[in-house]
Design a protein with these regions (language model features):
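Small/polar, glycine/serine/threonine/aspartate-rich low-complexity segments that form flexible
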Residues: 66-104, 227-238, 270, 283-316, ...
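Periplasmic alpha-helical coiled-coil/stalk elements that build and connect Gram-negative outer-membrane
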Residues: 135-247, 355, 359, 400-402
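Bacterial Sec-pathway N-terminal export signals of envelope proteins
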Residues: 20-68, 74, 221, 227-263, ...
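Transmembrane beta-barrel architecture of outer-membrane proteins
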Residues: 26, 95-99, 142, 187, ...
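Gram-negative bacterial Sec-dependent N-terminal signal peptides
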Residues: 1-20
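Amphipathic alpha-helical coiled-coil segments
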Residues: 40-55, 132, 136-155, 166, ...
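A glycine-/polar-enriched beta->alpha junction
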Residues: 29-39, 46-61, 99-117, 127-134, ...
Length: 443
């Protein structure tokens, strides 16, 4: 009765552990809330949204109010103009003045180009943020599958350790009864020592991968949902590389941002040339002033002025011409940056496509190799028992099987990641693309 009860408890604990394991979508949601790099990009987007308001302000009226309140105290001494008698006079009064001014640009090429440029700056911030969103998806998925890869490596290494331990014990028993030489024992001991060292390395690698995931999600990572056994990874659609490369050269968000940087550079040239152009403003102001105090008769005055002001720059020490040349060079730089970004995006798309297609073939080959390796191990174990195989044959078969299993799991993860990188390079990666991958996990 106790053994079935223990089995039920173990099974329940296993199911509870899986129920608590976080899947890829849940980890991504944690990263959305806690990743510092993504939060920085979001703040940059909010800041960029203010640029249009700032750029438009140069085309709108500028209204200001000013005023003064002065206390005047004057003393005069001199002969009276009628009787010639020296007299003193003292005057104390307050003078007050208030002015409201308005200036509306009628022609300001610099302000207009600044406004047009602000639209491009905002669009650039949006493209940069979209790229940051894609980068977050890639970083989360990469960190997630890095942890799974490390876990699989550790599991395989520990299984290999158990098998090697059994083989070492068998070699020692056979040596004691005289059916095998000490060489078999030494070979098994060497294999055991090696797998113990590999286990320590695998444990350390798993800790490092969990730490890397914690950096993205902002807290220690718990249990993660593993990939289901024998999953089928969908091939890329379209199945040709050229459409992906074409999309990467035009729709990749880094390419879009670089193109906007080029347009911004062109507008900057126009802005700098505005230093040679006149500015015309409609101006209006109204002034009200009055005086009060002892010895100063109260008086009030109002003045209203409406007209046009203009300014024509004549010479600025060649600063404007130099600024134009500088911005022309920066425009050329932006054009070259755009071309370099296009080439890089196309290269990533091509590499990711080839990596995914070759990865699918590699997964299929490794699945067949795993079956063959298991059969080889079983055959070598049987041959060892009947005396037609030696200990090193079994050890090599074990090593081949576990190495194949490690390669197979890594090939699956790499193929999935290449699919995500391919969509990112083409500018089409979205949060929804994690759903089919999440469905491959064991929930």
């Amino acid at each position: 009765m106790q053994r079935p009860l223990i089995a039920v408890l173990i099974a329940s604990a296993f199911l509870t552990l899986n129920a608590q394991a976080a899947d890829l979508i849940q980890v991504y949601q944690q990263a959305l809330a806690n990743d510092a790099t993504y939060a920085s990009a979001r703040s940059s987007l909010v800041a960029g949204e203010e640029r249009i308001i700032q750029g438009r302000s140069g085309l709108l009226p500028n209204i200001s109010a000013s005023g003064s309140n002065l206390r005047n105290n004057s003393y005069n001494s001199g002969p009276d103009t009628v009787f010639g008698i020296v007299t003193d006079s003292r005057t104390k009064y307050h003078s007050n003045a208030y002015t409201i001014s308005l200036a509306q640009p009628l022609y300001d090429w610099n302000a207009w180009q600044t406004y047009q440029q602000s639209k491009l700056v905002q669009a650039n911030s949006e493209a940069t943020f979209s790229q940051a969103q894609q980068d977050l998806i890639l970083r989360v998925a990469q960190a997630y599958f890095d942890v799974l890869t490390a876990q699989d490596n550790l599991t395989s290494t520990q299984a290999q350790k158990v098998a090697t331990t059994e083989q070492l014990a068998s070699a020692k028993r056979n040596f004691e009864v005289g059916t095998q030489t000490i060489t078999d024992t030494h070979e098994a001991q060497a294999a055991y020592d090696l797998v113990v060292a590999q286990e320590f390395a695998a444990i350390n690698d798993l800790d490092n991968k969990r730490t890397a995931l914690a950096v993205v999600i902002g807290k220690s990572a718990g249990e993660l949902a593993p990939l289901r056994t024998g999953v089928t990874i969908e091939p890329p659609s379209p199945a040709a590389v050229d459409p992906w490369v074409s999309s990467a050269e035009s729709q990749n968000f880094s390419v879009v941002a670089a193109g906007l940087n080029l347009e911004i550079a062109k507008r900057e040239i126009s802005r700098s040339r505005a230093g040679h152009m006149p500015t015309v403003n409609l101006v209006a102001n109204k002034t009200h002033q009055y005086n009060t105090g002892v010895g100063q008769p109260g008086n009030t005055g109002n003045n209203t002025a409406v007209g046009v002001s203009w300014n024509i720059p004549l010479f600025s020490g060649f600063a404007v011409t130099s600024k134009v040349r500088e911005n022309i060079a920066l425009e050329d730089k932006a054009r070259n940056d755009l071309e370099a970004t296009k080439r890089q995006a196309a290269q990533i798309a091509r590499q990711s496509f080839l990596g995914m297609t070759s990865g699918l073939a590699q997964v299929k080959a490794l699945e067949a190799a795993e079956v063959s390796s298991k059969s080889s191990l079983d055959s070598n174990k049987l041959g060892y028992q009947v005396g037609v195989r030696i200990n090193i044959d079994v050890l090599n078969a074990q090593k081949l099987l576990y190495s194949t299993q490690k390669d197979l799991s890594k090939a699956r993860y790499d193929t999935i990641m290449n699919g995500l990188r391919l969509k990112s390079a083409a500018g089409s990666l979205r949060e929804e693309d994690l759903q089919p991958i999440n469905a491959l996990l064991q929930h």
